Amino acid sequence: MRGLGTCLATLAGLLLTAAGETFSGGCLFDEPYSTCGYSQSEGDDFNWEQVNTLTKPTSDPWMPSGSFMLVNASGRPEGQRAHLLLPQLKENDTHCIDFHYFVSSKSNSPPGLLNVYVKVNNGPLGNPIWNISGDPTRTWNRAELAISTFWPNFYQVIFEVITSGHQGYLAIDEVKVLGHPCTRTPHFLRIQNVEVNAGQFATFQCSAIGRTVAGDRLWLQGIDVRDAPLKEIKVTSSRRFIASFNVVNTTKRDAGKYRCMIRTEGGVGISNYAELVVKEPPVPIAPPQLASVGATYLWIQLNANSINGDGPIVAREVEYCTASGSWNDRQPVDSTSYKIGHLDPDTEYEISVLLTRPGEGGTGSPGPALRTRTKCADPMRGPRKLEVVEVKSRQITIRWEPFGYNVTRCHSYNLTVHYCYQVGGQEQVREEVSWDTENSHPQHTITNLSPYTNVSVKLILMNPEGRKESQELIVQTDEDLPGAVPTESIQGSTFEEKIFLQWREPTQTYGVITLYEITYKAVSSFDPEIDLSNQSGRVSKLGNETHFLFFGLYPGTTYSFTIRASTAKGFGPPATNQFTTKISAPSMPAYELETPLNQTDNTVTVMLKPAHSRGAPVSVYQIVVEEERPRRTKKTTEILKCYPVPIHFQNASLLNSQYYFAAEFPADSLQAAQPFTIGDNKTYNGYWNTPLLPYKSYRIYFQAASRANGETKIDCVQVATKGAATPKPVPEPEKQTDHTVKIAGVIAGILLFVIIFLGVVLVMKKRKLAKKRKETMSSTRQEMTVMVNSMDKSYAEQGTNCDEAFSFMDTHNLNGRSVSSPSSFTMKTNTLSTSVPNSYYPDETHTMASDTSSLVQSHTYKKREPADVPYQTGQLHPAIRVADLLQHITQMKCAEGYGFKEEYESFFEGQSAPWDSAKKDENRMKNRYGNIIAYDHSRVRLQTIEGDTNSDYINGNYIDGYHRPNHYIATQGPMQETIYDFWRMVWHENTASIIMVTNLVEVGRVKCCKYWPDDTEIYKDIKVTLIETELLAEYVIRTFAVEKRGVHEIREIRQFHFTGWPDHGVPYHATGLLGFVRQVKSKSPPSAGPLVVHCSAGAGRTGCFIVIDIMLDMAEREGVVDIYNCVRELRSRRVNMVQTEEQYVFIHDAILEACLCGDTSVPASQVRSLYYDMNKLDPQTNSSQIKEEFRTLNMVTPTLRVEDCSIALLPRNHEKNRCMDILPPDRCLPFLITIDGESSNYINAALMDSYKQPSAFIVTQHPLPNTVKDFWRLVLDYHCTSVVMLNDVDPAQLCPQYWPENGVHRHGPIQVEFVSADLEEDIISRIFRIYNAARPQDGYRMVQQFQFLGWPMYRDTPVSKRSFLKLIRQVDKWQEEYNGGEGRTVVHCLNGGGRSGTFCAISIVCEMLRHQRTVDVFHAVKTLRNNKPNMVDLLDQYKFCYEVALEYLNSG
């Protein structure tokens, strides 16, 4: 039977071959197997044998018959292998591999395992696709291989036998590659590669042609990966089905090659290999970066350029949640930055970025989280329901409705109890912090109050962002014991027996005074005989009475008065004072005018009796002799009752006195009555008791005097009289009077009176004149104000376009600050929209505008002969209103600036007037350029020298100013041979200002010769001495003293040298040039001669300066500008003024900036009042002037274009930028010089000018971990001596600590060595020594880092103005001490933006104050923003600049 089958099979094979339906690769093994391309593996344990029983019969019953390939397993150990390799096949058409196999065993146990492999494209062997290992059948069986690998793939079929250790045979025969599908095994169509994201199911769809029945096995076979089971079969027709396989929960290890397999009863079908690609969803490597913080928002940079996982990124999401909460939110993001809104204030959030790649499950896990906190928000409202709980005399207790976070909107807040009350007429304001805020019934007790005082109380809820107040509550404290009556207020008017006592109520009444209690007591007396025991008592007075009269007191007695005041609460402390009654005169005994005891012609003897004391003992007794004269009347006698003034007898005649003291003796010498003789010619206590004259009548008086407490009281009594014995007169020589002395005295008195009278009249007259002058000045000022206002009204009524122009100027010109200076006045002229006045200066008939201008501006210019009218405004190029200037320039710049190009090309180019003098051979060497020379009609003519007619030539032309003929001289930069002529011109023209708009050398070419000395230089007969040099960032001001031989005059001449014009083109911005123009205007004397303006040729830059200067005047006076006709007029005076179209456009931009920004400088004396006014809120616009100023600043800040930052945007530099939207422009980049391997020379930093030094600051971001090395290269390369750090170290924000705390850090060739550190308030200062190890010959540099701690991340401005000013001063001091101010300062914050800009701006403002005593915050910030637009990017930071300026002024 086997032979028959073999014959039939051979016949069928021949028929198929004849029919062309078989392919190479088949083999019947009739010939050697190698002829079929079969081979065996060299590394096998044994080989297959080719057997042909027809040629070599066998008697072994277990061996099959025929020709075939055989493996004899008998005697072979288990596990040995033998491989039979078919040739490689590359078949694209549907085909089938058919083969027969035979298995027999001598022990009924399988002799081994027969496997079939299909290896594709010389790839790995993989797992068997077919095998037979069952019981031996001892018959030939047929199997099919339906292989679908498809072109251009190729494959190789391999038969493998693995012995089992049992005896038997395994054979294969009749391997055929048929050109038609297998009949019993389905064929797979091509399966496709599958790409999935990790963690997802990978589904392979295997379409097959054929039938499948129950019992067929389908699976997905992988190479070096796990197999996948069948998911489902979908039969689509009787001859087609689709099998689905899932590789579940895929990981990177599941990636590889898979093919579909089906095992049927007739064989096996295999598909081509398909690739399973497993992509890892992307995850950011770094957390997002915080760009800015608000109360309800966080602005972040995604920072997702570096990822783990696979791209591409098709979606970005931001996931955020509170740090302590369980909820989270996720928002899609379509840009590199995102603002998370609707957040809670003062809440910590965790923010992560999720990235998504294509496909299901393509969203990666959240990246590292940024943990940050929102700012506090302004409290929602103030505390409510404030009420009084308890009132005492010195304290009150209040309570209020409790509140929580929803009201405070900040976890860090203060509840301040603000209260005020009056004490002693002064308002006392106090604040206390209440800590009882968490209680359900919060209350606060205010202590140390004054009793019976109205206390105004309110609660202030404050957090870092704002404050809200409660309603005010007024409560009166309870009464208390009053204070003491002021001791100094207790005043007593003393009499001999009375004291009138007065006092004031207590300073601290502490209630209503209802009663005063006065206790008095005698404490001492001058009279020791007085009994004081009964001299005391108590008196009460009502509260409205503060005086009392005490009478019945003893003279000369000291009384103590004690006063207490009482309120309803009781008496307060006592106040005591003492007063002494006045002493009384002694009481003289009674004397009758009795006959004296004895009397002679020259004496009288009387009886003297002791007097009685009253309040003070008698001190002395005196005898007074009074001469009776006929003219003496009784009235006179009554007036001179006693004699307080002692007069010696010797002086009585000289003083023309009627009396004299004859004797004085102490009181203790007269204890009892005793006689005394008047005229006994003796001396008593210095008084001569001279004998009486017989011919005169006398009255004899006895008086007693008591002296105590600085007063003297006298009483006297007449004790005797003596009549004249003989009335005949006797001459008295001693009574002769010097009449000359008396007359002289009278005359002197009269003269003194006259002098005093005249002085009084003169003073009164002077005061009257001063008052009249003041009234006159006030009247004059009022008249001037009315005049100017009426002029404004008259022009406004005419409805001209100037009103709109000045409306624009008022809106945008910051000169509206009410800074009083002459230039702040603006004059309006009556102009039409199509024309401007005929000339820049008036003719003789032009009166009102010029006269008024002269009045307001107070300028006087040197009178010159009128020149030709400068120009007539053309109809095609009318003047432009200032209000329309922005729109005009925008239109002109359309279509690549076609409007400007057309206008500029319409100017006449080249010579337009004769220049014969300049062309003379004698003058050719005086011209720097042959085509820029002086026209004859407008050239400056010098005085000839020694008859040389050509010596009057200099290459310079007169140019008319605005309403000022020949106001400028445009000239070339002096050459070596024309320096003397230049100074001759300056002297001859009485010039006070020279404007130089070039550098001496540019691009290696000499543009101008240095025509000024560094000390003193003599140019023939002119001596020039340099007095002062003032260096500023963009210009230099030099002051010279100039003398001319033979002229006794020294002139002060200033040279304004603008150094900021670049070598090519025009300045990038006009800010510096506009400031330069204003300096020239402010420092040029109005009475001096023309301004001499020169560059190199005296045409291009010179023309720019002159046009800008003229147009600024025109814009201010008329509200219009006429740049086109101004340039045209300039060109009629000097060839090719404004040489390039670029310069022409720059002039327009400069004028626009000047009109928008205005002059914003403020004198130091006016800063405080101005800043106060700037912060006032306009109720109509709900805005303030400072907000408008900041808005204007934002409007004029230039926007960086992509081409401006081309270097920062290079792919190799991306990773060096913290934020891709905060980049330095190419023009101010500091390129790194120190070589460090292959590292680039780029760093995210920008050079910034200070007030006096160009490129004094380098503003940069906080170094990233990968740019720390570049940071120190920057410090070393650019000679930086200070580093200012305005942010915190925060590794989460990629802000590492970039300096060593001790020892040495090495960053490539640069070594940074720690030297010292110091902490002072909010500033940590560290000193480092840095050097380049690769260039030891360069030495080292000391660098001080100033880390400012007073600017928390959540605040827009520093906490303290004083601390920040101290930081500025410390940096300035270090810079000046270490390097003489020549070193640069590196300033950095997180991103090199707002904080760094604030530091630089304030530093500039402080320099302004130090050198110019002016403040110009707008100009300082505008200058910084010209290079980096994000400098000082918040209104609060802008205000802070003003506030630190005020702090600077306050600190002196």
Curated annotation (Swiss-Prot):
Residue span, Ig-like C2-type domain: 186-277
Known InterPro entries for this protein? ConA-like_dom_sf, FN3_dom, FN3_sf, Ig-like_dom, Ig-like_dom_sf, Ig-like_fold, Ig_sub, Immunoglobulin_dom
Domain Tyrosine-protein phosphatase: start-end pairs: 900-1154, 1186-1448
Arranged from A to Z, the UniProt key words for this protein are: Cell adhesion, Cell membrane, Disulfide bond, Glycoprotein, Hydrolase, Immunoglobulin domain, Membrane, Phosphoprotein, Protein phosphatase, Receptor, Repeat, Signal, Transmembrane, Transmembrane helix
- Taxonomy, superkingdom: Eukaryota
Query: Boundaries of each MAM domain copy?
Result: 22-184
Q: Where are the transmembrane segments?
A: 743-764
Q: Kindly list the positions annotated as binding substrate.
A: D1063, C1095, S1096, A1097, G1098, A1099, G1100, R1101, Q1139
Q: Which residues lie on this side of the membrane: Extracellular?
A: 21-742
Q: Which family does it belong to?
A: Belongs to the protein-tyrosine phosphatase family. Receptor class 2B subfamily.
Name of the featured protein: Receptor-type tyrosine-protein phosphatase mu
- Organism encoding this protein: Homo sapiens (Human)
